[in-house]
Amino acid sequence: MDIISVMNDKALKGTKKRAAIIELIVSGNLNCEQIEAISTEINDKQMASILEAIEEISNKGLSQLSSRYLLFAIPYIKSENNNCRREASRIVGNMAAQYPDMIEEAISPLLDNSSNEGTIIRWAAAYALSRIITTDRYAQSELYDKLTDISNKEEDNAIRNQYLKALKKASKVRK
């Protein structure tokens, strides 16, 4: 089964569709170039399913994903679709330590999302930014002060705690 068949299969719902996409990627039957090629042919909900599959692979280490997946996900941080924004942010967070030199362009939209009125979008931004700040490259940067300010203003404890834990970790690198 190819990605278009999976996307158009009405019998596959939610987690089964994600599992089918994961299997295609992990088995080598679907690569990032093929995903990029169909990205203009599918709707936001379908793209969110693909991003969700990539996020699960990157989170659980099911397969070694190339930096191309990271670069593919970054523009979706600014998507109109909140599911795409959330999953793209999580992909960046999951892959930040692996590709710290390739996440620069993700930081600005993540900072924008950190002040979004939606809790899920702010949480996803905090997830990614908290993993970025713990990399050697960013622990010593001005991002540290920005995240300190954001954490001081954040009212949601779960989101604030993500920042505080990461800032504590990053402060050890700063010494």
Residues covered by each model-derived region:
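Alpha-solenoid HEAT/Armadillo-like helical repeat scaffolds in large eukaryotic proteins
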Residues: 6-9, 34-42, 69-80, 106-117, ...
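N-terminal alpha-helical scaffold/docking segments in eukaryotic complex subunits
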Residues: 1-48, 60, 168-171
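Eukaryotic acidic, Ser/Thr-rich intrinsically disordered low-complexity regions
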Residues: 2-4, 144-175
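Alpha-helix N-cap/helix-start positions at coil->helix boundaries
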Residues: 12-15, 44-45, 82-83, 117-120, ...
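Alpha-solenoid HEAT/ARM repeat scaffold
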Residues: 15-19, 47-51, 67, 85-89, ...
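Extended alpha-helical scaffolding segments
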Residues: 113, 119-146, 150-153, 157
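Structural signature of alpha-helical solenoid repeat scaffolds
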Residues: 55-58, 93-94, 130-131, 167-168
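Helix-adjacent hinge/juxtasegments
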Residues: 63-104
